[in-house]
Structures are given as structure tokens and as C-alpha cells.
Amino acid sequence: MTSDPTSSTAFVFAGGGSLGAIEVGMLRELVASGERPDCVVGASAGAINAAYFAGRPDEDGVAMLAALWCRIRRQDIMPFSMRSLVAMLLRNRPHLVEADALRLLLERNLPYRRIEQAALPLHIVATDVLNGREVVLSAGPVVDAVQASAAIPGVFPSVSIGGVELVDGGVANNTPISVAFALGVKRIVVLPAGFACALRVPPRSAIAHATHALTLVIARQLVRDLELYGARAQIHVVPPLCPLDVSSYDYSQCAQLIDKAAERTRAWIDAGGLAQCEIPGQLREHDHAAVLSH
């Protein structure tokens, strides 16, 4: 970070499963507009984006991150099978699948080994599985930290770091504005994944149901956090996509999500969005019978 944290900027990347692709479109336009953060903070899927961007914080790095998201398929991250379900039940295993596929993806694509080696100061949020306490990882092996932050409880195994068992950072703090604020940063740009506000039918699988419900809870919590910290810091929230009918469990539409988010973010920037500190209407409870004003 810069020597004067009160004049520095943090990018905060939220969790959101496959909707993390939306943040990449937002990031593309923020960087193209000249935004350069002094540090990055991320949780869950947002930890993947934060870690990758921290290693290559420029337009080429964003393009490479977008290409990565476009290659990802659900089986690359969550390789579910009947065999894995049977193994969980018969062996009394506390998780559905091993995290080998996710770990391999991270090892192949992150261009550095330790958090301290990133080009930007990087802070990854995870959750202590025993007490729900937020744990901020600002040093140590980056793959372990990101894997811990993305370890959905019950789906992936916890990750042991420093003798503490850690799971998904979204459990404790999915959009870690408070972490950026605690670092002394006074200008925060939030990249929220949003939620599928226009689904026509409920998600079909148990995990899709759970992840969708979590995104709804997260959006409500983000609004409360913005109300809490809005008077204490300069916070700019990039509006998420709305209406959105893509589940956070659906990885087949990442390219479209990136491009659409980039288009909407460019329009928001051109309209003076980075000069405003407002809570986007897309994050609040709404239906699509009414036209959102933001």
C-alpha cells in the first residue's frame, strides 16, 4: 500500500460462485478507465479474482483472467459424481468432493507462490470453521489461502493454515468492505457479483438451491455494510447485472456475463458512477414489475 492509506484505493471483490465472472467484466472497464488500486481484498470466488489481479494488475492481466473464466466448467471446480456422494455417506466424510481440481486450477494459473510476492498488497478472507471468526490472510502460500477462502462448507474440505481449519470466506464476510476499512483505506471500489434476481423457476439441484439462497443473504448483508461504512469511507459500488437469470452454480455463461458486465460498467463510469457514493438499487430487494432507478 502507499505510505498514506487515507489517500489510497482498495478494490473489494465479493463472492458469488460462477457470478464471479461478472466482476471480471467490471474490472476490465475500471482498469481501462485508469483506476489503479493500492491493494485488493477478496472472499470466496472474489478471492480468486483478487489473487489473480494482484499478480498482474493491468489490462493484459484482466484479459488473461477473463480467458480463464471462459475456460472454466463446473466440473473443473466441483467434480461431483455418484461415487463422491457414496464416499461421503459411507465413509462419514464431512465434505462432498476433494478440492484437487480447484487446487490444480489455481496452481496452474496464479503466477506467484506467496501472497507477499503479488504486485499489489493482497488480503484474502476466510472463516474459522469452529467459531465463524473472520480470518484475513495477508501472507503465506497464496494457493492455500485462496483454496481456503473458496472452500464451501460441506462441499469442499476445510484448509488448515497456522493450525486453524478454514472454510469459505463468504460465511464470515462475503464482501469484505470492513477489511479494507480496517487497513485504513478511505476510498473503496466494490465489485459485487450480485444475485440471480430474475429466475423463472427455482434451482433444480440441492447445491444450486443452497448457493442461490446464499447469494440472496449476501446481497442483504452487503446493503447493511454499505449503510454502516458509507459515512466513514468513500465507497463506490459498481452496479451488478440486473435483471439476471443465471444461477451462481451455472458456469456455462461466463463469457456472456463478462461482456455484459463490462458494457454496463462502461455506461456507469461514463455516467459519472465513480464520482457517486450510492447503494445500487440492484442490490436491494426488488422485483421486475418495477423499473430500477439505478
List the model feature ranges, each with a label:
Residues 1-43, 48-294:
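Patatin-like phospholipase
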